[in-house]
Structure formats: structure tokens, C-alpha cells
Amino acid sequence: MYEQFGVEGLITFQKTVDYCHEKDLIVIGDVKRGDIGSTSAAYAIAHLGKVQVGAKKIPAFNEDFATVNPYLGSDGITPFLEVCKEEKKGLFILVKTSNPSSGEFQDQMIGEKHLYEMVGERVAEWGSELMGDSYSYVGAVVGATYPEQGKLLRKVMPKSFILVPGYGAQGGKGEDLVHFLSLIHI
């Protein structure tokens, strides 16, 4: 929403991120980035890394996590994973989103599996390279509006944090959230 206001919006976004860090909050940049490798590398540096300016490396937006669209494949994800390893940051990859039309693509069958399940498997694979104490720094976005898919995806990604949008106004219910929880203790 910040971007609709142009440069002033981005400046305000930066100030918001800085303020949250001053308050010791974890910042998730819901930016849904993803592109070809070189462009994803630039996005990864901008949101999670440090950019070289002369002799200095300085953070740009400096979120702790960013949401990423996997539709372009590993070419678009790998640059983010590399920056996350270097900077000890994380990702939330779109797997099964909460919006009503998400099924137009995410529910398509490829062989015996839905596309969202295959993406979940890749999230688990990518996440195995970026493990914290119990959970991976590579998480997933799975909408509260799809509790059955959430139940399946929790099994596919047992060590991934799941960011669960869609609770409340979009129709996700509290009792459905249990499917998104894991038995791993932090």
C-alpha cells in the first residue's frame, strides 16, 4: 500500500521499518516479490540485504522477512535464499493464498498433486538449507480460508513457519487455525 504514494510512500515504509526495529519488533515485508534471477537479486538486496555504495555496504529497507512469489521458479527464489543465508533473514513464500481466485492456478493438478502442494515441497526443501533451532527461515503463506489445504501443507512443511492471512474479514475462523500449527516446540 505504501508504493501507491510513490517515493513519499517508500520513504514512509522505510520509516515504519526503522520504527519497528527501534521497538525490537520483527518486520515482515509483505512485498510479494519474484522475478528473473538478476531482478530478484536486486529485490533481495533491497528488502533483506545490503547494497554496496562506494566503500560501504548499507541496508535499504532492511525487513527481517519478505514475502516472495515462487511462480518464476528457483531462478527467482535462489537470490533471496542467498541473501537470507548471508544476512540471517527469512522468507515467506506464497504457497496457497487466501484470495478467492487463488485456485485458478494454485489448485491445478500436476500429476497426482496440486500445484500448491508441489510449491510446499519446494519450500520444505529450500528451508532445509536455512534452519534455525527448530524452524526454518523459509516459511510459507497459506490462507486461513483454506483449512484443509493448511492441514495438508503443515504435514508437507513441518519445520516451516506459516504466515496465515485471511483470518476474520476474509472468512478464516479461529477453529481452523489449529491446522496450521506444528508440534515442534520453539
Kindly label every feature range from the protein language model:
Residues 185-186:
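Conserved small/polar residues in nucleotide/adenosyl-binding loops
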Residues 160-165:
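Short hydrophobic/aromatic-enriched beta-strand-loop microsegments
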Residues 17-21, 81, 85, 124-128, ...:
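Surface-exposed amphipathic alpha-helices with a cationic face
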Residues 1-59, 149:
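N-terminal active-site wall of soluble small-molecule enzyme domains
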Residues 4-6, 68-77, 141-149, 167-172:
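Active-site glycine- and acidic-residue-rich loops that bind
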Residues 30, 66, 166:
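Conserved, mostly hydrophobic/aromatic
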Residues 150-153, 173-181:
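Catalytic cores of alpha/beta
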Residues 35-138:
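Conserved anion-binding
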